[in-house]
């Protein structure tokens, strides 16, 4: 299978940590690249595509956008996290999850483009973890 290479993001960042598969949605990745270009700073992806099995094994939601290739978690904190959230809202990301608790190296912002029709709840939606 030919793997699409995405500007700014490595295969290792995007692949499922359980199976090694990469099944990112092309429209989602186009929007993520646009965010990265507007941010004008590197973005470290800590979680990209997840198989259903891997998602279940880490306690992910059965409706997770990660299993559809429509989400990433970006490792960031402080002003960078703020700027990512601001740009994500401007660019129309539908799901923004904020985890800014604990050590800085564990903090992240979840970004997804899953719509109300897919998940069955109102979108856009912003939430915090913990």
Question: What are the functions of these language-model segments?
Answer:
Residues 13, 26, 53, 58, ...:
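Solvent-exposed, flexible loop/coil residues
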Residues 33-59:
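Extended, low-complexity, intrinsically disordered C-terminal regulatory tails
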């Amino acid at each position: 299978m030919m793997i699409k290479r995405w500007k700014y993001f490595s295969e290792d960042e995007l692949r499922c940590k359980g199976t090694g598969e990469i099944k990112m949605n092309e429209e989602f990745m186009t929007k993520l690249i646009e965010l990265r270009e507007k941010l004008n700073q590197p973005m470290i992806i800590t979680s990209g595509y997840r198989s259903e099995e891997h998602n279940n094994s880490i306690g992910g939601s059965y409706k997770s956008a990660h299993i559809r290739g429509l989400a990433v978690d970006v490792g960031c904190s402080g002003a960078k996290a703020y700027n990512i959230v601001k740009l994500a809202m401007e660019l129309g990301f539908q799901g923004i999850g904020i985890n800014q608790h604990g050590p800085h190296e564990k903090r992240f912002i979840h970004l997804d483009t899953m719509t109300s029709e897919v998940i069955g709840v109102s979108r856009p939606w912003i939430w915090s973890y913990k």
